[in-house]
Amino acid sequence: MNRQGKSVEISELSKIFSSSGSIVVAHYKGISVAQIKDLRKKMREAGGGVKVAKNRLVKIAIRDTSIRGISDLFVGQSLIVYSDSPVIAPKISVSFSNDNNEFRVLGGVVEKGVLNQDSIKQIASLPDLEGIRAGIISAIQSNATRLVRLLGTPQTQVVRAISAFVDKNQQG
């Protein structure tokens, strides 16, 4: 790759690092091209991407940024999995790692915070934004249903009491 090509690659990498909500760094030694294509497809469908780049160029791209702490992860055959969502890249990377033993998640960045492998795995276990929204809506709906039942119960009891009183007076 010539100097101009390297410059273009560095600017592409800088754009990925500055605009992504989450970035996962992984080793892919021993992974087939078909498996990498599968990972790329999953990330593309989720709105993210996978980038294989020379470690030296990645280190130059992050040298003067707040995420330069991940530069130590770029040794050997490394790739970057990224997405705008803080959960998507970790979730898909960890899932892919569980299915492919040769693919090893090393660490990454979420919302400009440098994280180790364990933290990335913890984030991967979190529900995505849609799951959180569904949980909140479910909680609100169940509480609203309980409230309606609670408000309806005294009225029902009053009606039953009046009905019993009327029945008693009609009999007696």
Curated annotation (Swiss-Prot):
Gene3D superfamilies xrefs: 3.30.70.1730
Does Hydrolase appear among the keywords? no
**The organism's place on the tree of life at top rank:** Bacteria
Q: Does the keyword S-adenosyl-L-methionine apply?
A: no
Q: Which GO terms describe its biological process?
A: translation
Keyword annotations of the record: Ribonucleoprotein, Ribosomal protein, RNA-binding, rRNA-binding
Family matches, as InterPro entries: Ribosomal_uL10, Ribosomal_uL10-like_sf, Ribosomal_uL10_bac, Ribosomal_uL10_bac_type, Ribosomal_uL10_CS_bac
Recall the GO molecular function terms of this protein's record.
large ribosomal subunit rRNA binding; structural constituent of ribosome
Q: Which GO terms describe its cellular component?
A: large ribosomal subunit
What CDD domains does this protein's entry cite?
Ribosomal_L10
Q: How does it assemble?
A: Part of the ribosomal stalk of the 50S ribosomal subunit. The N-terminus interacts with L11 and the large rRNA to form the base of the stalk. The C-terminus forms an elongated spine to which L12 dimers bind in a sequential fashion forming a multimeric L10(L12)X complex.
Query: Which family is annotated?
Result: Belongs to the universal ribosomal protein uL10 family.
Give the function comment from the record: Forms part of the ribosomal stalk, playing a central role in the interaction of the ribosome with GTP-bound translation factors.
Q: What is this protein called?
A: Large ribosomal subunit protein uL10
Q: Which organism is it from?
A: Liberibacter asiaticus
